[in-house]
Amino acid sequence: MAAGMYLEHYLDSIENLPFELQRNFQLMRDLDQRTEDLKAEIDKLATEYMSSARSLSSEEKLALLRQIQEAYGKCKEFGDDKVQLAMQTYEMVDKHIRRLDTDLARFEADLKEKQIESSDYDSSSSKGKKKGRTQKEKKAARARSKGKNSDEEAPKAAQKKLKLVRTSPEYGMPSVTFGSVHPSDVLDMPVDPNEPTYCLCHQVSYGEMIGCDNPDCSIEWFHFACVGLTTKPRGKWFCPRCSQERKKK
């Protein structure tokens, strides 16, 4: 079920909740007011009894005491009714909270299921691409085998289609340029198996790269795309790992 459907159903279920809460709160306020009125009546009866107890007959005393007792009984009833209303209001809100928790759990389960389906689709798609790339590599290998003799005579350095060229940066920042080379082109280029790898991606050098200004950096060189750069920054630049280490210090 889509997120919009879960939200729509939940909003429908709580549509009358504000009115029900308002009604219960109003009833509790009414009970409070009636209790206060009874307490005032009890105070009046108690004062009357204390002030005229000596002049009243036994029957009159009993009548006043009975009125006070009945008023206290009604106060207790109003208090019990208020407690019941408060419990009903709490259960009403709690029911909707539990409904929301259940819908959220179902929504999260649906999201996980869709992520698994998407992952399976991506996996099967990548297998197809890998198979196509393998066939392409076989064709390239056959083409290279035709010129094997000439390749063997060429020095290893000539097999690298990419060559690091250090520039003289304006701000003393190490920088590397490789011309207009794209990562997709690197897959088709014959690379010396002994060629060193760089960057967080552990790939060979290609495209625009930048050097970390930390002399103790274990990686040193990074592809622009891998560290989120599009242009050479001004001043000194430190890689993500070295930046974290500098912050800790």
Swiss-Prot record:
The record marks 198, 209, 213, 221 as: Histone H3K4me3 binding. PROSITE patterns: ZF_PHD_1, ZF_PHD_2. The modification N6-acetyllysine is found at residues 112, 127, 129, 146, 148, 156. Keywords: Acetylation, Apoptosis, Cell cycle, Chromatin regulator, Citrullination, Coiled coil, Metal-binding, Nucleus, Tumor suppressor, Zinc, Zinc-finger. GO terms for biological process: apoptotic process; DNA replication-dependent chromatin disassembly; negative regulation of cell population proliferation; negative regulation of DNA-templated transcription; negative regulation of growth; positive regulation of apoptotic process; positive regulation of DNA damage response, signal transduction by p53 class mediator; regulation of cell cycle. InterPro entries: ING_fam (IPR028651), ING_N_histone-binding (IPR024610), Zinc_finger_PHD-type_CS (IPR019786), Znf_FYVE_PHD (IPR011011), Znf_PHD (IPR001965), Znf_PHD-finger (IPR019787), Znf_RING/FYVE/PHD (IPR013083). A motif (Bipartite nuclear localization signal) lies at residues 127-148. The modification Citrulline is found at residues 133, 166. The keyword Cell division does not apply. Residues 115-163 are annotated as: Disordered. A zinc finger (PHD-type) spans 196-245. Zn(2+) 2 binds at residues 212, 217, 239, 242. Citrullination by PADI4 within the nuclear localization signal disrupts the interaction with p53 and increases susceptibility to degradation. Zn(2+) 1 binds at residues 199, 201, 223, 226. One of its GO terms (cellular component) is intermediate filament cytoskeleton. The keyword Signal does not apply. Its main location: nucleus. Homodimer. Component of the HBO1 complex composed of KAT7/HBO1, MEAF6, ING4 or ING5, and one scaffold subunit: complexes containing BRPF scaffold (BRPF1, BRD1/BRPF2 or BRPF3) direct KAT7/HBO1 specificity towards H3K14ac, while complexes containing JADE scaffold (JADE1, JADE2 and JADE3) mediate acetylation of histone H4. Interacts with H3K4me3 and to a lesser extent with H3K4me2, the interaction augments KAT7/HBO1 acetylation activity on H3 tails. Interacts with EP300, RELA and TP53; these interactions may be indirect. Interacts with EGLN1. The PHD-type zinc finger mediates the binding to H3K4me3. The N-terminal coiled-coil domain mediates homodimerization. Belongs to the ING family. Component of HBO1 complexes, which specifically mediate acetylation of histone H3 at 'Lys-14' (H3K14ac), and have reduced activity toward histone H4. Through chromatin acetylation it may function in DNA replication. May inhibit tumor progression by modulating the transcriptional output of signaling pathways which regulate cell proliferation. Can suppress brain tumor angiogenesis through transcriptional repression of RELA/NFKB3 target genes when complexed with RELA. May also specifically suppress loss of contact inhibition elicited by activated oncogenes such as MYC. This is Inhibitor of growth protein 4. The gene is Ing4.
